[in-house]
């Protein structure tokens, strides 16, 4: 099964010049979604981790399914002002602007070894911010996995420069 067949590109979304990959067809197809989680799990097994951090918002989908499949804890990194309790925050640059991520202070145990997960690796900014966020809060980051890496944006090189070990199911 070629999972890229279930990730059609949408040109100029959310801004001109961006090719957005729509995950809706992949999620709507039970066999494709099951295969996606199996392949993410195969990558995750190469890391030593106790918890998964899903990055808003599509990282929530893959991260929660993978955490359930792998019997691991799950936490979320959200956009600003979405969490009800005290949180840690990190600002970062995007392919098309800037934003911030937050995690709730009480979500993860102090000895957590965290695997980051998101749907797409573009420039690496989001995963680098999540890594910095967790490390500044005192957690160990085991690495990062994504469903798709957009190779021309050189995100994997940026992750390497920041000492973040990354693996992706697909590259385009």
Swiss-Prot record:
Matches recorded under InterPro entries: Ade_phspho_trans (IPR005764), PRibTrfase_dom (IPR000836), PRTase-like (IPR029057), UPRTase/APRTase (IPR050054)
A Pfam family that the UniProt record links to this protein: Pribosyltran
Any GO molecular function: AMP binding
Gene: apt
EC primary class: transferase
Record keywords, A-Z: Cytoplasm, Glycosyltransferase, Purine salvage, Transferase
Protein name in UniProt: Adenine phosphoribosyltransferase
Gene Ontology CC terms, in alphabetical order: cytoplasm
GO annotation, biological process: adenine salvage; AMP salvage; purine ribonucleoside salvage
Record's subcellular location: Cytoplasm
Catalysed reactions listed for this entry: AMP + diphosphate = 5-phospho-alpha-D-ribose 1-diphosphate + adenine
NCBIfam families: PRK02304.1-5
SUPFAM superfamilies to which the protein is assigned, alphabetical: PRTase-like (SSF53271)
Keyword Cytoplasm annotated: yes
């Amino acid at each position: 099964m070629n999972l890229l067949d279930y990730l059609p590109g949408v040109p100029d979304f959310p801004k001109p010049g961006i090719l957005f990959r729509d995950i809706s067809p992949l999620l709507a197809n039970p066999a494709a979604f099951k295969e996606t989680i199996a392949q993410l799990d195969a990558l995750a097994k190469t890391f030593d981790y106790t918890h998964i951090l899903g990055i808003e918002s599509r990282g929530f989908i893959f991260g929660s399914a993978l955490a359930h499949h792998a019997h691991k804890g799950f936490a979320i990194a959200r956009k600003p002002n979405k969490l009800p309790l005290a949180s840690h925050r990190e600002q970062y640059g995007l392919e098309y602007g800037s934003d911030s991520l937050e995690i709730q202070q009480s979500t993860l145990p102090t000895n957590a070894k965290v695997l980051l997960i998101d749907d797409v690796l573009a420039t690496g900014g989001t995963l680098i911010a999540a890594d910095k966020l967790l490390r500044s809060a005192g957690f160990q980051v085991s690495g990062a996995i994504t469903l798709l890496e957009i190779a021309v944006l050189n995100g994997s090189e940026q992750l390497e420069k920041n000492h973040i070990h990354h693996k992706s199911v697909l590259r385009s």
